[in-house]
From Swiss-Prot:
Organism: Psilocybe cyanescens
GO MF terms held by the record: transmembrane transporter activity
Domain of life of the native organism: Eukaryota
Family annotation (SUPFAM superfamilies): MFS general substrate transporter (SSF103473)
Compartmental location: Membrane
Record's function text: Major facilitator-type transporter; part of the gene cluster that mediates the biosynthesis of psilocybin, a psychotropic tryptamine-derived natural product.
Membrane topology, as annotated: Multi-pass membrane protein
UniProt record similarity statement: Belongs to the major facilitator superfamily. TCR/Tet family.
Record's GO cellular component terms: membrane
Name listed for the protein in its UniProt record: Major facilitator-type transporter psiT2
Cited Gene3D superfamilies: MFS general substrate transporter like domains
Segments of skewed composition (Low complexity): 260-270
Gene name tied to this protein: psiT2
Region called Disordered, residue ranges: 1-20, 260-299
Length: 528
């Protein structure tokens, strides 16, 4: 063949080879793209067990809401002045969160080193025990001590967030995270229902609970039931919850592979005698894969400083602080506002009706998490949805401040009752208020997804812990701050007793401004 002929063939052969290679690569890319779109199967059993443990935390926290003000009043610490009850009940709720602040980071860091199970299960059991004992309190000091102890152990909550993140990936997050977020509103629906229904059970239901013990301790039963639910969850966790800490999971897989290889090598040696090839195969099979080797190199958790200086983590922490402060304040103020008599600046609802109102709010939040949140997370930008949720708070506090003037329009000072028409309007306003207040619930699962998106996987519990610390500090401060603000406003009749409304709306607007930083940081990262 002539050189010219050979030269003329070479480009064609080369082009054919490139075409085949490009076709092969395109098929591979298409297959990879399709594979990425297929959601990873959800570990239903593990998530079910984890949800049973997480389910009790909001119940334990919220079962106090309907009766805590009455409990404090019965203890006598407020000296019979209902205007000061809110201050002391706020302290009870604050010290629980203070205990969490003191232990969250320590427990989260510990779980990043020794595993999730050894920290999560004992902590949940301890919270259950101190919750049951709280119902036996006979003094304000005893109430404070028991709630602090429960709060110290409740600091393990971020570990649950980490386990959920480790059991899921980006392909099934949009489904699992809203389902996980559903646990909190369900707990917030059941907790107040338990508290409002079972307080003074011996008086309400003498045929069923007419025991002298329950007459002496009328708040024991609503504390004991959440304890029992927590014990059931811990029992399930002890027998069925698997360890998810990445370093421990990798070590277990490596050990299982070594055992399997040793067993095969042993049988092969027995049949044919040991050879260099067999030893080489065993050595290769127990070696780390490239992915495992990379994980092994990067398995050391990030330092606290590295997490804090990260702009995205700072934005999430700051926004989370406002979110938790405003969310908890709305619940605390609503409970106190409803408990306070109309002439003292409130609405004057009994504890059982307050419990029903919180239960309705929990059902609303549950339906939103189940029906709306998954679609929202798939359709819209997470940072923008977060900002939208924060916009609900100024409206919540503004509407809440209108309830007392509305109640006063139909209030009879002689009979201490509200006209039925006014009562209907009042309940309608409360329904709208609760709906607005539960819009922000979507922000909590979004916060969890943003943490996973921006934090190193080997420091996930620590990152969750840092965000949870900032949120828990807010939860520790807001019951005392908001209830004291309410008491000061009403007792001194500042702005007609509504100074607290003006201040809470102002804080809400500051929270909206802070939430915009998440969108700014996210956009900047995408541009890089």
């Amino acid at each position: 063949m002539s050189p010219e002929r050979s030269a003329s063939l070479e480009p064609d052969e080369h082009s054919s080879l490139l075409s085949d290679t490009a076709s092969y690569i395109s098929r591979d890319d298409l297959e990879d793209s399709k594979a990425k779109q297929i959601p990873t199967p959800i570990p239903k059993k593990q998530l079910g067990v984890l949800f049973s443990i997480r389910f009790t935390e909001p119940i334990i926290y919220s079962h106090l809401w309907p009766y805590i003000n009455q409990f404090v009043n019965d203890i006598g610490v407020a000296d019979g002045n209902p205007r000061y009850v809110g201050f002391y009940s706020g302290l009870i709720e604050s010290v629980f969160a203070c205990g969490e602040v003191c232990s969250i980071f320590m427990l989260s860091r510990l779980s990043d080193r020794i595993g999730r199970r050894p920290v999560l299960l004992p902590s949940a059991l301890g919270v259950a025990l101190f919750t049951a004992l709280f119902g036996l309190s006979t003094s304000f000091t005893m109430m404070l001590v028991l709630r602090v102890c429960a709060g110290l152990l409740a600091g393990a909550t971020p570990i649950v967030h980490s386990v959920v993140s480790e059991l899921t990936d980006e392909t099934n997050n949009a489904l699992v995270v809203p389902l996980y977020g559903l646990i909190t509103p369900i707990g917030f629906a059941i907790g107040p229902l338990i508290g409002g229904t079972l307080e003074h059970a011996a008086t309400k239901y003498p045929n069923v609970f007419g025991y002298d013990f329950l007459r002496k301790y009328p708040y024991f039963l609503p504390s004991f039931v959440p304890c029992c639910l927590a014990v059931v969850g811990v029992t399930f966790g002890y027998f069925f919850l698997q360890e998810t800490l990445p370093s421990i999971v990798r070590a277990k897989k490596r050990l299982e592979r070594q055992k399997s290889t040793s067993s095969i090598s042993s049988r092969t040696s027995t049949l044919y005698g040991a050879t260099d090839d067999h030893n080489r195969d065993a050595s290769e099979s127990t070696a780390l894969s490239p992915e495992e080797a990379e994980d092994e190199i990067d398995s050391k958790p990030q330092s606290i400083k590295a997490l804090i200086v990260d702009p995205s983590m700072r934005a999430i922490m700051g926004s989370g602080t406002f979110l938790m402060f405003l969310y908890t304040s709305s619940d605390v103020l609503f409970s106190l506002y409803c408990f306070t008599a109309v002439e003292d600046g409130g609405v004057g609802l009994p504890p059982d009706e307050i419990g029903y109102a919180f239960s309705v709010a929990g059902v609303i939040a549950m339906l939103m998490q189940l029906c709306i949140t998954p679609w929202v997370l798939r359709t819209f930008d997470k940072a923008k949805v977060y900002k939208f949720c924060m916009f609900s708070f100024p409206l919540v506090f503004a509407l809440m401040g209108c309830l007392n003037p509305l109640a006063q329009t139909g209030y009879n000072e002689v009979s201490k009752t509200i006209h039925p028409t006014t009562t209907g309007l009042l309940y309608a306003a409360i329904a709208v208020l609760l709906l607005l207040a539960r819009v922000c619930v979507m922000a909590f699962p979004i916060s969890m997804m943003l943490i996973k998106q921006n934090a190193d996987k080997n420091s996930l519990a620590t990152a969750n812990g840092l965000v949870q610390v900032s949120m828990t500090i807010a939860r520790a401060l807001c019951p005392t701050v908001s209830s004291s603000l309410f008491a000061y406003s009403t007792s001194n009749n500042i702005l007609g007793g509504h100074l607290w409304v003006l201040i809470m709306v102002t804080i809400s607007l500051a929270g909206v401004w802070q939430s915009m930083s998440i969108a700014r940081v996210t956009k900047r990262k995408e541009e890089l």
